[in-house]
Amino acid sequence: MEERPPENEGPQREPWDEWVVEVLEELKEEALKHFDPRLLTALGNHIYNRHGDTLEGAGELIRILQRALFMHFRGGCNHSRIGQPGGGNPLSTIPPS
C-alpha cells in the first residue's frame, strides 16, 4: 500500500488579505468606541503616508490599535473616549522607568 499525505478535508481558509481587512475593521470599530475619531484619522493618515494602501501598512495599524486598546483596557476603561473631556491617559498605567 502506497503512503500518501492526508487529504486536506478541513474548511478552506480565507485569503490572508481578506482576513487582515476583517481584523482591521473589527479593531477600528472597537477603537472608535474608546478613542477620539480625529486621533484615529490622524493615525490612519500617518500609516497611509508611510506605507500606502498595502498589507504592511494594515499590519502596522493593527499592531498599534491592539496595543492602544490593551493599554486602555488595562488602565481601566470607563467607556470614555481618550483625547476628549473625561478621557483618561492610556500611558498612566505604565510605571516610570
UniProtKB/Swiss-Prot annotation:
Gene3D superfamilies: 6.10.210.10, VpR/VpX protein, C-terminal domain
GO biological process, one term: viral penetration into host nucleus
CC annotations in GO: host cell; host cell nucleus; virion component
Positions of region (Disordered): 78-97
Signal peptide as annotated in the record: none
Compartments (UniProt record): Virion; Host nucleus
Keywords, ordered alphabetically: Activator, AIDS, Cell cycle, Host nucleus, Host-virus interaction, Phosphoprotein, Transcription, Transcription regulation, Viral penetration into host nucleus, Virion, Virus entry into host cell
Main location (coarse class): virion
UniProt-listed Pfam families: VPR (PF00522)
Phosphoserine PTM sites in chain numbering: 80
Record function comment: Stimulates gene expression driven by the HIV-2 LTR. Prevents infected cells from undergoing mitosis and proliferating, by inducing arrest or delay in the G2 phase of the cell cycle. Cell cycle arrest creates a favorable environment for maximizing viral expression and production.
Subunit architecture: Interacts with human UNG.
Other observations noted: This is a macaque isolate.
UniProt-recorded name of the protein: Protein Vpr
Lineage: Viruses, Riboviria, Pararnavirae, Artverviricota, Revtraviricetes
UniProt gene name: vpr
